[in-house]
């Protein structure tokens, strides 16, 4: 979910769990965006039958609690693997500041409901952003299911994703990441973040739309 914007269905996760149990495998589940999903409830891999003793959850505070830069994460794992995780941890990084740990405790309590309010705001932005991106010639964007990224198909522009990103950056001042950075299946995609304000997102799309004739000029030049 963190690379793109999709959320595994219950059916897919159940099948993964069945395979893990059948073949006695561990599942490493990155759930950093678990609280930022839209129109559905997230089910952790650990909740499926037989998975509590074979799931290692990776999570943190930078996404759901806007604690980016404080660099605090955690694992939830079976007791049998904790010694190995501790050995890895103490040889990879050292002490997290005490005040950050206290802040994390308060974040998990979330007494004021800040995270749900943040997700509601992201929901408004993702709907607006996807709708406006679809008005750009050559762009196709399904509404994101989770996180705060838009995964946009740019195949209809007729040029490579890297070239689309270059034009947007140099001529419109808008940054995106070529999808191939996340694997070969992303070669016809670019990824945007919609963690900015609605006004900034709207301005970004307007700028992209103004430079979109460059898609055709670049394709013809080739």
Briefly describe each language-model feature range.
Residues 4-222:
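PLP-dependent class I/II
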């Amino acid at each position: 979910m963190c690379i793109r914007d999709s959320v595994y269905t219950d059916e897919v996760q159940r099948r993964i769990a069945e395979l893990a149990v059948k073949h006695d495998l561990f599942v490493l589940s990155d759930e950093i965006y678990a609280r930022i999903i839209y129109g559905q409830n997230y089910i952790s891999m650990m909740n499926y039958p037989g998975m509590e003793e074979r799931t290692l959850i990776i999570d943190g505070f930078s996404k759901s609690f806007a604690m980016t830069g404080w660099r605090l994460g955690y694992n939830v794992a079976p007791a049998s693997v904790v010694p190995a995780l501790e050995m890895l941890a103490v040889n990879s990084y050292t002490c997290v500041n005490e005040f950050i740990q206290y802040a994390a405790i308060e974040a998990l309590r979330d007494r004021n409901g800040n995270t749900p309010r943040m997700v509601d705001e992201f929901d408004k932005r993702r709907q607006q952003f996807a709708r406006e991106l679809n008005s750009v010639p050559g762009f196709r964007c399904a509404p994101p299911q989770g996180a705060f990224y838009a995964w946009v198909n740019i195949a209809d522009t007729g040029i490579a994703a890297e070239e689309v990103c270059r034009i947007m950056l140099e001529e419109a001042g808008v940054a995106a990441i070529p999808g191939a950075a996340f694997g070969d299946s992303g070669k016809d995609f670019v990824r945007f973040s919609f963690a900015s304000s609605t006004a900034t997102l709207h301005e970004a799309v307007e700028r992209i739309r103004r430079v979109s004739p460059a898609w055709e000029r670049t394709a013809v030049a080739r």
